[in-house]
Amino acid sequence: MPLRFGGMDDRALVERQLGRSPRALLRLAARCPYGAPAVTEQAPYDDAGDPFPTTYYLTCPQLVAAIARLEAAGGVERWSGELERDPELAADLERATDEQRQLRRQLAAGQTGRDNGSSLELGIAGSANPRRLKCLHAHAAFALANPGYRLGERVLAEIDPLWPPECCCSGAG
């Protein structure tokens, strides 16, 4: 039985949050404080066998918009520079990247999709080089799904307030 929020099941609410049907959706990985979906976990491959390199996908409209503003203000470049200056932060990213790869192999359960498994070795946000950040949304989603991931948590710490005063999905259903 699907979980329900505001009269909608979670999948329908995620679809509404994204404005499209979610691709390769497996489950919810995190919720906002109000109980709405915030992060989904995706399969490494969609039904057609095409790679889907983002394991944890941010769906909360408030967070998606806030992180888009961070990226537009040079956040990817700034955090890439921080990784070069902070070896402990870089080591934590490497640990999370290894965790991401292990999870993707586990979720694939022996399937290799159209790419013969090459995307299973990609890092967070589908990055071939973990030190070259691509998408802060994916790092924030990883941190919400796996508390303790420092880079994602530091990105989230830039959003004030992290969550809106009331649920941004409260009009659903």
Language-model-detected regions and their locations in the chain:
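Preference for intrinsically disordered or flexible, low-complexity segments
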Residues: 2-173
